[in-house]
Amino acid sequence: MNNKNESVTSVDVIISGLGPTGATLAHLLGKRGLSVLVLEREPMFYGNARAVYTDDECMRVMQAAGVAAELSANMQVDTPAQWVLANGKILGQYWRLDRPYGWPIINFLYQPWLETTLSDLLERYPNVRVARGRELTQFTQDEHGVTVTHQATSTFRFSDATDARQACEVDPDPQTIRGRYLVGADGGRSTVREALGIGMSGKNFPEPWLVVDLEMKEGEDALRHLPYFSFICDPDCPTVCCPQPGRFHRFEFMLMPGQTREQMEDPTVVRNLISRYVDPDKFEVKRKLVYTFNALVAKDWRKGRVLIAGDAAHMTPQFMGQGMSSGVRDAYNLAWKIDAVIKGQAGERLLDTYGSERFHHAKAMIDISVQMKDFVSMSSPVSSLMRNLLVRTVLATPFLGRYVREGRFKPAPTYVPDSYLGMPRRHRRSPEGRMIPQPEVRTFKGQRVLLDDLLGDGFALIGLEVDPRVHLSQASRKLLDIQNTRFATLFPFGARPQGADTDRSNTSELLELEDVQGEMVAWFKRSGFSSGAVAVVRPDKFTFAMVEAADLNRAINELKFQLQWSPGAEVVADEPRLLRKIA
């Protein structure tokens, strides 16, 4: 990755912002071979933790981006989340150890480590360049692309550029660059969103909270008694107690009526608050900040060739840990669609499904986060007592208790009807518009591999005990080849055909897989299908269709229609392209 501000005339995609959303998008696009320029206004990495958690869906995205192993090595996983009373007794607990999407459901992280890792790993792509200390100032667009003007950040100090890894050589003069598309991943105060005139709907919450980030001093062992994530439901001082990897820990305290920002950020007050839970002499306070939060979502996510993502598109209260995760989901949804349009594999209308799909899911995450905030931050003794009685009653009820203990109140990765790229659902359990499971499967060589690592980055056809290729017309096969589709036959564990003439496995042609854990076979059955059915899977691992093999060509015709693909459309070779530079 070239961090120097060399003159570049054009790229495929310009990204404004190198936070988790922008960095994830850069990885996904870079892996697909597109040329990318990322403009990051901060000349050096912003070293404070903000996000502390991500989930299995987002780790699946990081797997697709090729960075999951490096990130998970520095995460704390499978940590129970608890609702705790003021006296220390547990009111309720949420935890799951299964892996429906291939990764732990609960992953606590230290954001400076995560962002540094994402940024450093972009160096593997010669077609991706990060320009630090550069901020987007204006842009214009036409039917062919976007022209972006960027300049040295107004607060940039040239002494900041002494760190070659984190800074760039900065030309103080404005520069312009041409891109096929511009993505504004530039945060809640998005310059891109404001320039587009896109408004946001939702609510601003006036209730302030004090966040205190701690780092345990070297040689100390002062966090052993706080192994879990806890909402401390104390009506006198609602508190969040959050473990993080390494020596880090976070507390959040809700301000009560009459308490001010100046009072609560006072070092003595901070010391008194954290001393309820830890010995303050064994910690360094990395950050203390009073903040309020927003629950907002943008009314539009695309205008022409300019799109917004992450906090620029939605602002999520922190109480479900879904702010960063929602932005990562945006990147996954958007990356393959931009790639397909640029390479002539789909028409531009495909990009409209980005907003229609992601809006409702992001809004659902915002809503559940607000509900969780209301649940844990009750300051009335009467309301708190009623809440505690309700929780105990729910947990004593078998179905509802399981629903709460397993965290099934969190919105599933499912798109609302009539909003998604895919065939309509026939019944409540139809898989269309839903993320497919990701178990380990067994290859014909006897290796156990996560399913996505075999399906790749394009479309996939998975036949249950049937070779989907056999049922494809010539026209269907042509479309699927254009989409870089992979084909798989899935067998129940131990049921793969044997004999000298049955081993047809070829990773470029047909994957013969065994469902070791039984999750995929169960998924077909839940959807109302058995042997002989085929699932058409999108590049982001959502289901386009599930049909009987005899109806497969009908589903592929529908795919062709929804992609707006037609023979003769330009298809760009799927190879990395170096940034095009002025001679």
Where in this protein do the model-derived segments appear?
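Conserved FAD-binding catalytic core of PHBH/FMO-like flavoproteins
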Residues: 120, 156-157, 163-167, 173, ...
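FAD/FMN-dependent oxidoreductases across multiple families
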Residues: 244-247, 261-326, 346, 351, ...
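Helical substrate-recognition/capping region of FAD-dependent monooxygenase/halogenase enzymes
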Residues: 2-12, 16, 32, 116, ...
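Glycine-rich FAD pyrophosphate-binding loop
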Residues: 30-50
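Helical element adjacent to the flavin cofactor pocket in flavoenzyme catalytic cores
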Residues: 109-131, 136, 162-164, 169
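A conserved short coil-to-beta-strand element within the FAD-binding core of flavoproteins
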Residues: 132-147, 153-155
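Active-site-adjacent segment of FAD-dependent monooxygenases/related oxidoreductases
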Residues: 50-123
